[in-house]
Amino acid sequence: MRSASTEQPSSERPVRRTPPTGVARTTPLTALSRVPWADIQDSTGSAAAIPLLLNGIAWGDAETARSALEDLRKRICQYGFVVEQATAATVPFLWELAQLPHVSCRPQIIQLLKAIADARQWECTAAAYPKLLNRRENPVVWERAARQAVRARRGDLGRLMAEQDTEIARATSELARALSD
């Protein structure tokens, strides 16, 4: 005759051996810790909050992701055309998020990448005021680095253009046009 177990039921979650459906097999944003966020600047000062915002986009519900992306946009591409020191470091993570099926605001991420690719505010200002180029913190260099970071991943455009979601495909087509210049 068997006796009933005297062990208490566990309140711990079981260890999940496979990722949830629709989630990439590799964890997104694993390289975030390699960037010295506290040592670089966004529009608010220290860029230390950027990893939290990127994680909010990656793992938050639709409203959380949308809010995090809007806050991130204000920090790295203020007004839709003024890039910051942290912008170039953030771009590879935006490309990564734009390709993850579970991320709810992918078209808006692609639109942000296009805004960064189009950014020429600091270059235009420096053309009129060359002294801007003599500053220790040179925003023209940031702007060029950010545009180059977007261009560096243009090989990912084909995969995004093949998406069934028409909003993603349209945003990707606009980004592709911006990168073809």
Where do the PLM segments sit?
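N-terminal "cap/leader" segments of large eukaryotic alpha-helical scaffolds
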Residues: 2-65
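Residue-level detector of extended alpha-helical repeat arrays and alpha-solenoid scaffolds
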Residues: 65, 87, 106-109, 169
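Alpha-helical solenoid scaffolds in eukaryotic proteins
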Residues: 47-56, 88-97, 152-159
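HEAT-repeat alpha-solenoid elements in large eukaryotic scaffold proteins
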Residues: 22-32, 62-75, 113, 125-134
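Flexible loop/turn segments at the boundaries of HEAT repeats in alpha-solenoid HEAT proteins
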Residues: 38-43, 79-87, 120-128, 139-147
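Eukaryote-biased recognition of C-terminal alpha-helical segments
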Residues: 132-146, 151-181
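Conserved hydrophobic register position within alpha-solenoid helical repeats
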Residues: 68-72, 109, 113, 143, ...
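Alpha-solenoid helical repeat architecture
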Residues: 57-61, 98-102, 161-162
